[in-house]
Amino acid sequence: MKPKLYVVTGAPGSGKSAALDAFVRLRTPYLAFDIDWLGVVASDLAGRSIFFDRSKWGPYGALWFEVLHSVFRNGRVAVFFTPNDPSDFEAIGLPAWCGGVEWLLLDCGDVVRSDRLRARPGWTEAMVEEAIEDARSLLQAVAKIVDTAEHTPAQAAGAILAWLEALTSGDR
């Protein structure tokens, strides 16, 4: 049976980084990865920013699919934290080894998101508005949601763990 990808998504300001940090501290058997962890090195390799050059997003996604495949080859389960949505994965194309994708959305209300993003250095109003639009798109695309305005990062991490355990309980 082909392994599945387990993806935790959320628009900017959704609390992905805080939830990921708390999830890693749980020391679960799952291996967590943030799409940004290879961003600087991949940009250096590509000679362009993978953060802003849309022509590099497909190859960067393909690189991550191979990293995640390596985890599965070692008999482990990876969970991938990314702002991507299902249409992004469709555009890249799922790799042949992948048996499907399970999605979990971290989300919060627009006011909370706006406050979080405005507190970040360098965030403009246009960037905040784009993040709000991204959040609305994700709400339409992903059914399973954890509200990070209602949960602490530790509670969100616990919800992520419960989601993973429910989906993988027959695989162990």
Residue map of PLM features:
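P-loop (Walker A) phosphate-binding loop of NTP-binding proteins
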Residues: A11
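ATP-binding Walker
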Residues: S14
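Walker A/P-loop
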Residues: S17
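Small-molecule kinase domains that catalyze NTP-dependent phosphoryl transfer to phosphate-bearing small molecules
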Residues: A119-A162, L167
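Glycine-rich phosphate-binding loop used to anchor ATP phosphates in small-molecule kinases
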Residues: K56-G99
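Conserved substrate/cofactor phosphate-moiety recognition/catalytic segment
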Residues: L20-F65
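Hydrophobic anchor at the beta1->P-loop junction of P-loop NTPases
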Residues: V8
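Conserved phosphate-donor/acceptor-positioning beta-strand/loop module used by diverse small-molecule
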Residues: T82, W97-R118, V146
